[in-house]
């Protein structure tokens, strides 16, 4: 993988953890993007000195522009969904890590692949909604698709020798069960959004935490696994409250 990274969705949970890795290993950060978290983005710009920054929210773009006005060596700013796509396609972008939340990530994923960039993918919706588009584009352009989601990354690492990849039959995706695991129907009555946001193992963004509590996230991960590893959607799921178990392949 290139040691030059362009990080889409840099201010979210996965984005900030990815920058921890860049900091630890000295990776060059070519570009960053965010939706509206200007203060976090300003701190990241000050530390990592990206050449380009894309901001999709119009008001946040204006706020960031004003904050950077007159600064020497300020990054070039790109605006809106078009700016996000442009950032993903740039020469010199290196490996594009897509940690954008939601369907907005699909266009950026395809843009990066079609521009010849390896794609480290944390955006579930790219494969859930456009799996055939993404996998076809990867094959056509001869790039690497690297899963970032912990379960899929665990499987990917298990399959790095040719024998394992050729003989894969089943994938087991683990599920913590979220904050409501083991509760009876009666115990679930009256639970609130605030309760659902109390994940027992991880501090994540609100959307993925709610998806975890309802097990919707695990359904998305099953679809992802089917596209990533070429298996029918009958992968087995099992519940493991321990965060140490991520995935198992057979």
Question: Could you describe each region identified by the protein language model?
Answer:
Residues 149-154, 200-229:
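Mid-domain beta-loop-alpha active-site segment that forms a flexible
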Residues 55, 77-80, 97-98, 121-122, ...:
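General beta-strand structural signal in soluble alpha/beta enzymes
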Residues 1-103:
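N-terminal glycine-/serine-/threonine-rich beta1-alpha1-beta2 phosphate-ribose binding loop
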Residues 106, 111-115, 131-196:
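Rossmann-like NAD(P)H-binding beta-loop-alpha module
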Residues 156-169, 218-234:
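Oxidoreductase and adenylate-handling cofactor-binding alpha/beta cores
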Residues 238-250:
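Single conserved hydrophobic/aromatic residue that forms the stacking wall/gate
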Residues 117-128:
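ADP-ribose/adenylate-binding Rossmann-like module
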Residues 49-51, 73-75, 115-118, 141-143:
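A short helix->loop->beta-strand "cap" motif at the edges of active sites that frequently abuts
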């Amino acid at each position: 993988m290139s040691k030059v990274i362009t990080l889409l969705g840099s201010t979210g949970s996965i984005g900030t953890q990815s920058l921890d890795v860049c900091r630890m290993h000295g990776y060059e950060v070519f570009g960053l993007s965010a939706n509206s978290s200007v203060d976090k983005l300003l701190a990241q710009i000050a530390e990592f000195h990206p050449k380009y920054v894309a901001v999709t929210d119009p008001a946040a773009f204006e706020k960031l522009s004003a904050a950077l006005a007159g600064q020497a060596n300020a990054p070039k700013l790109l605006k809106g969904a078009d700016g996000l796509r442009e950032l993903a396609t740039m020469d010199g972008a290196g490996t594009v890590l897509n940690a954008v939340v939601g369907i907005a990530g699909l266009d950026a994923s395809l843009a990066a692949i079609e521009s010849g960039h390896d794609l480290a993918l944390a955006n579930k919706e790219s494969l859930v909604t456009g799996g055939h588009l993404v996998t076809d584009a990867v094959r056509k352009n001869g790039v690497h698709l690297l899963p970032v989601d912990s379960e899929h990354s665990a499987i990917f690492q298990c399959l790095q020798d040719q024998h394992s990849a050729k003989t894969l039959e089943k994938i087991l995706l683990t599920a913590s069960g979220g904050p409501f695991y083991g509760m009876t129907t009666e115990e679930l009555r009256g639970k609130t959004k605030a309760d659902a946001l109390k994940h027992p193992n991880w501090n994540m963004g609100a959307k993925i935490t709610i998806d975890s509590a309802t097990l919707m996230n695990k359904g998305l991960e099953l679809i992802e696994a089917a596209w990533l590893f070429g298996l029918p959607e009958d992968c087995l799921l099992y519940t493991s409250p321990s965060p140490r178990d991520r995935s198992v392949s057979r």
